[in-house]
Structures are given as structure tokens and as C-alpha cells.
Amino acid sequence: MAAANAYPGYQPVRSRWVSRVPEHWSLLRAKNFLREIDDRTKTGEETLLSMRQHRGLVPHNDVSVKRIPPENLIGYKKARPDELVLNRMQAGNAMFFRNRLSGLVSPDYAVFRLLRDDCPEYLGYLFRSWSIRGLFRSESKGLGTGTSGFLRLYSDRFAALEIPLPTRPEQDQIVAYLRAQDAHIARLI
């Protein structure tokens, strides 16, 4: 049995990962709604953040006993709340998160600031979805396959990706739904 359309009209998308989206959604290249930021620490005194698959960005000292002195962090990238952080070597493995804390991340990570009033949490969910992970993997360059290897999603390739974006109220509604589903699943575990 075919599923009913949730929206009155759809537009086709030139993409390998989705064939159509609601006609009122925007189709924007990533560079048109995100700007890559390269702001580096001069002191290394800020909190070092570590990226974890199931927790996102967390203080390094909360997940590791290895302490890193500030002088070793000079040149690391600054990340602020509501910016998005991408581990370029692990984009295809869903290592792309909304940042909730001020701190430092690896100089090899990409830090993005929103150019529009999009929901950063929605974008975090979107960029970790299975479809987008496949797209990121196909756009990455390097050696290896699957979850192993050295595949890097370069900034120019990410910037050129066409991403369908719902309106901000729809983004907020999707995030509320996903939070509720996450809470429901957590209760069952």
C-alpha cells in the first residue's frame, strides 16, 4: 500500500540521496546558509572539547584522563554555542554536531556558523541522518571504504552540496518530534 503524501505538492531534487521534497522548502547549497569559521586560540586556555559519536561535543576532561597542557592547544579552533562542528575525516560516520559549549576543537575540524535563522539542532540531526551520511561518504576523498580508511570531506565539496531546508517552524517541529522519539527510545532501553 502506498503512503499518502504529507504535503500538497513536491519538487524534484537533483540529488542522489533524496528524489523530492515539499515544494515550499528551500534548496540551498551549504555555503549559502553556513559559513566556515577559522578562529584560533592564541592561549590554549579555553576548554578542550572532544567529539563523541553518541554524545556530540563534550569537555575533554569529562571523557579522558589524559590532560593536555594549554601550550599544546595553541592554534586549535574556537567553537561557540550553536555553531556546527564537523570532523572532516568522519563525516560519513555522522561526526557532525551542534555545539552547546564554548571551547576548542581540533584544528582539522571544520566549524560552521549559521547565516540564516535555521535551527542548529535540526541541522545537526540532518547531517547525521543515514541519507546525508551516504552523501558525505560519496563526496569524501581519500583511501578506504566503509567506516575505516582515511576519507576526508573537503570544505569546497561540502559547500557545494545542495541541501533541502524546511521553514524554521518546521525545523523546530521536526526537532521536537525527534527529541520525543529519543526520549521514548531511552525509556525502553
Question: Where are the regions that the model predicts?
Answer:
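Basic, amphipathic alpha-helical recognition segments used for DNA target recognition
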Residues: 29-41, 101, 111-168
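Short amphipathic alpha-helical coupling segments at ligand-binding clamshell hinges
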Residues: 122-126, 177, 188
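Non-catalytic DNA-recognition/assembly elements of restriction-modification systems
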Residues: 6-41, 164-173, 177-187
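Short, ligand-facing micro-motifs at secondary-structure edges
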Residues: 45-65, 84-110, 125, 134-140
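Short glycine-enriched loop/turn motifs at secondary-structure junctions
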Residues: 12-13, 104-106, 155-157
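Sequence-specific dsDNA recognition surfaces
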Residues: 11-14, 28-42, 46-81
